[in-house]
Amino acid sequence: MADERAASFTKRSIKSSSKLSGLKLALSMVDLTTLEGKDSPEKARGLCRKAVRPWERDQEVLEERLPSVAAVCVYPSLVDVCAADLRGSGVKVASVATGFPSGQYPLEVRLDDVRRAVRAGADEIDMVINRGAFLAGRYDEVAEEVTQTKRACAREDGTAAHLKVILETGELETLDNVRRASDLAIRAMASAGMPPHEHGGDFIKTSTGKVQPAATMPVTLVMLEAIRDWYLETGEIVGMKPAGGIRTSKQALHYLVMVKETLGTLPDGDAWLTPDYFRFGASTLCNDILRQIAWHKTGRYMASYDFSEA
């Protein structure tokens, strides 16, 4: 059933003007990510430059300045580098923590990982749940770990970093498990008793990008429905981040159509069509979006070397 509903969103016809607006919106929702063993301060700085100015030739070729992306996502050891480079830019610094990507480290080690990243300047923390505990039915344990992680996002000034809870849906085996994990994560974040964010909110996220399958439309639809039902119950907005496997502009537009038709009719439905509450975790997507924008504006495709790889 979810497969059929998700497939229906790929059949919508989008007008050219709406498509261009959608591409720019999708660009503003990208979390540029590098999570490799060979990451370095130099690579992180390149990622930051790309995040602030996705295409350095935009004004020359398009006669307009394209939006920055939403965030860069790095390991905790590179948070301070990115925080310094992005200060005042509006681009957020996100960091994976909690024993990414396995989630199998002792809880106190994972919480210390979060606190260090927040102190270093992280605006957002992408945590990963312990799938072994979840699949063994230890739901209270998983929920408590999410709650404790949310509390570890607190800053000394009374604010807190935003939290994205990665479910690693490719390891959850069934869509019923995806729904249960979504509900669990949303309620566990809410039970932390943290003050509301001034801008944006906390998220649930599909994947680490290290496991296949990563983000799929049926999985994302199930998670969006959990977000919708929580909103109808409480009035609280929770964000959504599909991550991994979204490589083309066409795919990104399909996801935005799904968000619009699933959440857009709610009283605050437009909120999910902003980077505050919807993100794409897909670095390779960025340049494909830029190529498509260039084609819509100029009638010609740019070569891959026209865009930096960060």
Predicted regions located by residue number:
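Charged, compositionally biased N-terminal leader segments and the immediate start
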Residues: 1-30
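Alpha/beta enzyme core
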Residues: 17-25, 38-67, 77-241, 247-277, ...
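A short, histidine- and acid-enriched strand-loop-helix "catalytic/donor-clamping" loop
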Residues: 35
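Short, flexible loop segments at boundaries between secondary-structure elements
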Residues: 284-287
